[in-house]
Swiss-Prot record:
This is DNA replication and repair protein RecF. The RecF protein is involved in DNA metabolism; it is required for DNA replication and normal SOS inducibility. RecF binds preferentially to single-stranded, linear DNA. It also seems to bind ATP. SUPFAM superfamilies: P-loop containing nucleoside triphosphate hydrolases. It comes from the Bacteria. Its main location: cytoplasm. The gene is recF.
């Protein structure tokens, strides 16, 4: 899988750019604030149907413009796809091979991407939200149906929480509707939990392999699903998860009415990361946390390959300055041989370190992306 070329117009600060890309390595060099990360954001958006930086579409449109356009030409096995997204201040319009699509979520399952940036340290050291988002984004790309489950679950959860608030304030007293929401929450929520457990079962093997390579076998990383429903939930079948979830809601009912929100479910769960048996979020050094984040991203890359039959596009946003030689060379080894990669940097790092048959280097300045004729 690789992007042959991409057209951007008025996306963030990017003016009008048509870029012919290398099918392996592409390096984008420029000072901060020139548009490098905006370019990666556009690619990420086309793969995941969402920005990793904002939920407000208007922020994606260049100042004083009415719309932004991102169009890319994707080569996927023997298939060629033209994917076009127009972002207005109120709506997004998507076309695939010039055929209008009803939902922007139809982007999912076409272009697969893995993004690694300095912000990914939050994946390890910050709260559970970042790790849930990591799992959900990955699952939505390889299983677009999962995105539908997640969207439906969040709608049901919102309705249930609204009802709990009304019961808390005394505006309502009948709990009959709560039982209806409970059953829907259980049906969808249990499937989300099961999907997350399945992906963690695969990721933990891949992450362990990557981590041992990076650390020369000195450290072992372990991933596990930490559920708000029950210990050892990963050992349960789908119907057992439903029973546990249902019972949890019944047992929590009085407290939930008192607090006005739902206390258990996949929205409260976490991906636990340990290194040599130690909770790395609480006790790991920043170097260990960064290594763990890199291991997770490399595992994500290999997981998508195993699920989709080809590697996703790898986006590296100013990460080379954050990595020591060993971690940098591990990334270089991967991208040089198998993966179309986009790297952003503020200066020319040692490109001679990269053993790849082809490379394109681009200059990014004031929203304009141009190719360097020579290094």
């Amino acid at each position: 899988m690789y992007i042959d070329r991409i057209y951007l117009k008025d996306f963030r600060n990017l003016t009008e750019n048509l870029i012919k890309l290398d099918n392996r390595l592409n390096v984008f060099v420029g000072l901060n604030g020139q548009g490098k990360t905006n370019f990666l954001e556009a690619v990420y958006l086309m793969g995941t149907a969402s920005s990793h930086r904002t939920n407000a579409d208007r922020e994606l449109i260049r100042w004083n413009q009415d719309r932004a356009v991102v169009q890319l030409y994707l080569v996927k096995r023997d298939e060629k796809l033209k994917i076009s997204l127009e972002i207005n201040k109120k709506v997004k319009k998507l076309e695939i091979n010039d055929v209008p699509q009803e939902r922007v979520s139809e982007l999912l399952g076409n272009l697969n991407v893995v993004l690694f940036s300095p912000e990914d340290l939050k994946l390890v050291k910050e709260g559970p939200h970042f790790r849930r988002k990591f799992l959900d984004t990955e699952l939505s790309q390889v299983k677009p149906y999962y995105h539908y489950l997640l969207k439906k679950y969040n709608h049901i959860l919102s309705q249930r929480n609204n009802l709990l608030k009304e019961l808390m304030t005394g505006n309502k007293s009948d709990t009959t509707l709560l039982e209806v929401w409970d059953e829907q929450l259980v049906e969808i929520g249990a499937k989300i939990i099961q999907n997350r457990i399945e992906v963690i079962d695969k990721l933990k093997i891949l992450a362990r392999l990557s981590h041992r390579q990076i650390t020369d076998g000195l450290e072992n990383i372990t991933l596990s699903y930490e559920s708000s429903l029950s210990d050892r939930i990963e050992e349960k079948e789908l119907e057992e998860i439903k029973i546990i979830f249902r019972n949890k809601l019944v047992n929590n009912r009085n407290e939930e009415i008192t607090r006005g929100y739902t206390l258990a479910g996949p929205q409260r769960d976490d991906l636990k990361i340990t290194m040599n048996g130690i909770d790395i979020r609480k006790y790991g050094s920043q170097g260990q946390q960064r290594t763990a984040a890199l291991s997770l991203k490399l595992a994500e890359l290999e997981f998508m390959k195993s699920e989709q039959g080809e590697y996703p596009v790898l986006l590296l946003d100013d990460v080379f300055s954050e990595l020591d030689n060993k971690r940098r060379h591990r990334l270089i080894d991967i991208m040089a041989h198998r993966v179309q990669t986009f790297i952003t940097a503020t200066d020319f790092f040692n490109l001679n370190e990269i053993n790849t048959p082809s490379i394109k280097v681009f200059k990014v300045r004031n929203g304009l992306i141009t190719r360097y004729k020579s290094l």
